[in-house]
């Protein structure tokens, strides 16, 4: 089967936003206008086409990024709907990795919100070009200029409108295209009838002023345009479009559009802009991987059908009808169903059974998938998120993804023996799907402990165990993932010497421990000179330290952000062994615990609370009573916003508390920010509790 759409006419885009900015509704409308669905489903009635897991439909939030293929104006658009709830940032990270561009959806009343900041940061890390869609222009309190202002103030983004909305709230009914200087007026409720006219006299001065600002902003990052602009030359529509496209693809400029997905206005123009300004797979930097057998040999995966096949698996899902589905993005070459591929990451050969192109929750079987496309494979047994699939003769490993460690843990107990087996199966499958979900058995208590990115994350996973895997389980109280670190530097000795007839054990190390910068992790330096410890034992010293650090020195929590410099020691020709040096290193760490002032660290959450002004005093008092630090306050429309850092340990059950404190009128969102030292009195309680006192 020949390729239906050229690479130049392919767009892989994500739709990202804060929870409730209207992201799923926007995607729904895209599918409606591109002819993918015939009836519009509303998120708040639980009928949305993209939200296909039962829980998503109940909660009205998107959890997994479903990948959908749509067509618009002779282009293929692969859309990945990403979750806006902060507990699901891994889903966002995963989808950003395989996108070429994104549409950031903002709520016209709130502008940039905390989760928008998080997702924006992630998109910047991956260098993803973006356009911004300011949604909900029909909402009471909608303010286009305020929202654009938040892009500048909170994200320092070079973002400028390429449209001017006419009217706001219930008066919003038309949009001026500032590039072409045309007025688009909506004449029916479904948004399918649009009248295109010249910009009327009463709006002309405003539109021209905004167009001037737009040209100036683009000229700042485009020399050719700058010369013309300064020379007072006329800039044609095509020149302006080309300059906006260039600046957007280079991630130097973000076009801003307006609309209301719910009321069907502005979505088609946003689709036009996605095609006009977001890159095709040919416009983004080619992905650089390395040879499977040599990390130093770079291999470029070119977006070309005739190149060797290379793809990245970015999501694994268990589907009730076909079993395990592996979503992947093809970076180079083509793949036919029924063929064999190499999983270079795992070093295993896999057979691709069927290839499906997904449409939210319905699917279409295809025989070939081409370079630059996104599809799902059935039949891959060993492939997990972040693995590279490639041609057996041309093996390459594409860069994989980094996933954050869980910040919250719960114990789960199956209710019966039958549930025990089902639960083991469920945990394996859920971990395959979600790399930020961890499960292990506590060696001391025998309990199964699950870890994730927040309360909602774990709630949903436990709920999925019940629904999809029919596991009845009792869930314990949440536990915080504390960490430990050193505050002082000290040089210590760790010596292990055992003589008990026959061959003994001997290892002796001198190590200087010192605090590392926050987030710096563990750094090991080998400063041995003159062979006082033979080279072959050095890795054992590092391994011994790493193992011992896992269990900490105070209360059994992992020790982080520490530097260790091995500078002296001694060995015995006969009695020294790798094991002896491992033990010596762990003894040195025990010794360091006495001298390096170890402390316990706790996860601090960046919290934003929005509520009516009359509750401000109560909320501020409540934040302070939870050991929170208020970082700032501002008015947003007729509501007040409090931004604070609060320890995760104090935030359990906060949703219920906030509801009762504000009669259900307050909302909050939180995201993990950093680790901070726990106050002495609380640290003592944690240590006592962990020692069973």
From Swiss-Prot:
The lineage of its organism: Bacteria, Bacillati, Bacillota, Bacilli, Bacillales. Residues 8-282 form the tr-type G domain. It comes from the Bacteria. SMART domains: EFG_C, EFG_IV. Its main location: cytoplasm. It holds the Pfam family EFG_IV. InterPro entries: EFG_II, EFG_III, EFG_III/V, EFG_IV, EFG_V, EFG_V-like, EFTu-like_2, G_TR_CS. The gene is fusA. One of its GO terms (cellular component) is cytoplasm. This is Elongation factor G. It comes from Macrococcus caseolyticus (strain JCSC5402) (Macrococcoides caseolyticum).
């Amino acid at each position: 089967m020949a390729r239906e759409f050229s690479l130049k006419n392919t767009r892989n885009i994500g739709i990202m936003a804060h929870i409730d900015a209207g992201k799923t509704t926007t995607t729904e409308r895209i599918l409606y206008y591109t002819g993918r669905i015939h009836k519009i489903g509303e998120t708040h009635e639980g009928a949305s086409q993209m939200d296909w897991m039962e829980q998503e439909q109940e909660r009205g939030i998107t959890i997994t990024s479903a990948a959908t293929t749509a067509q618009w104006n002779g282009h293929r658009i692969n859309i990945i709907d990403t979750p806006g709830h902060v507990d699901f940032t891994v889903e966002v990270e995963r989808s950003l990795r395989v996108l070429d561009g994104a549409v950031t959806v903002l709520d016209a009343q709130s502008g940039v919100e905390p989760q928008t900041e998080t997702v924006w940061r992630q998109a910047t890390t991956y260098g993803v070009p973006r356009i911004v869609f300011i949604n909900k222009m029909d909402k009471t309190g909608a303010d286009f200029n305020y929202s654009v202002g938040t892009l500048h103030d909170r994200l320092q983004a070079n973002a400028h409108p390429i449209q001017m909305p006419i009217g706001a709230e219930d008066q919003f009914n038309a949009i001026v295209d500032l590039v072409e200087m045309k007025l688009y007026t909506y004449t029916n409720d479904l948004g399918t009838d649009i009248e295109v006219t010249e910009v009327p006299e009463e709006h002309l001065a405003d539109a021209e002023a905004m167009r001037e600002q737009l040209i100036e902003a683009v000229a700042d990052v485009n020399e050719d345009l700058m010369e013309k602009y300064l020379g007072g030359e006329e800039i044609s529509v095509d020149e302006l479009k080309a300059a906006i496209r260039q600046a957007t693809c280079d991630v130097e400029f973000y076009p801003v559009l307006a609309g209301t997905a719910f009321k069907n206005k502005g979505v088609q123009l946003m689709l036009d802009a996605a095609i006009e300004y977001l890159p095709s797979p040919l416009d983004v930097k080619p992905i650089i991987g390395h040879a499977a057998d040599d990390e130093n040999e770079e291999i470029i995966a070119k977006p070309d059908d005739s190149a060797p096949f290379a793809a990245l698996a970015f999501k694994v899902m268990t589907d009730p009808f076909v079993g395990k589905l592996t979503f992947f993005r093809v970076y180079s070459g083509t793949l036919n169903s029924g063929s064999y591929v190499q999983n270079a990451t795992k070093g295993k050969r896999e057979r691709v059974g069927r290839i499906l192109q997904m449409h939210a929750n319905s699917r279409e079987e295809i025989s070939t998938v081409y370079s630059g496309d996104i599809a799902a494979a059935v039949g891959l047994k060993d492939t997990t998120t972040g693995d590279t699939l490639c041609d057996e003769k041309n093996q390459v490993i594409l860069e994989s993804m980094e996933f954050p460690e869980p910040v919250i843990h719960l114990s789960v107990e199956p209710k019966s023996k039958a549930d025990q087996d089902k639960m083991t199966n469920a945990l394996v499958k859920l971990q395959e799907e979600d790399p930020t979900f961890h499960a292990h058995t506590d060696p001391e208590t025998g309990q199964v402990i699950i870890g994730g990115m927040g309360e909602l994350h774990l709630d949903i996973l436990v709920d999925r165990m019940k629904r999809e895997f029919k596991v009845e389980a009792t869930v314990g109280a949440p536990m915080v993932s504390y960490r430990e670190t050193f505050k002082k530097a000290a040089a210590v000795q760790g010596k292990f010497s055992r003589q008990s007839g026959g061959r003994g054990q001997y290892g002796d190390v001198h190590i200087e421990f010192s605090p590392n910068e926050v987030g710096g992790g563990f750094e090991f330096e080998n400063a041995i000179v003159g062979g006082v410890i033979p080279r072959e034992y050095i890795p054992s010293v590092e391994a011994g330290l790493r193992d011992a650090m896992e269990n900490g020195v105070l209360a059994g929590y992992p020790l982080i952000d520490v530097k260790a410099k091995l500078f002296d020691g001694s060995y015995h020709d006969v009695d020294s062994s790798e094991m002896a040096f491992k033990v010596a290193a762990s003894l040195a760490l025990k010794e360091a615990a006495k001298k390096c002032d170890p402390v316990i660290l706790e996860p601090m959450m960046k919290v934003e609370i929005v509520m009516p002004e009359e509750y401000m005093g109560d909320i501020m008092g409540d934040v302070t009573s939870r050991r929170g630090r208020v970082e700032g306050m501002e008015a947003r429309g007729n509501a007040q916003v409090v931004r604070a850092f609060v320890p995760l340990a104090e935030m359990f059950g906060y949703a219920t508390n906030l509801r009762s404190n504000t009669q259900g009128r307050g909302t909050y969102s939180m995201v993990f920010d950093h680790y901070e030292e726990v106050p002495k009195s609380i640290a003592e309680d944690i240590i006592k509790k962990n020692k069973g006192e």
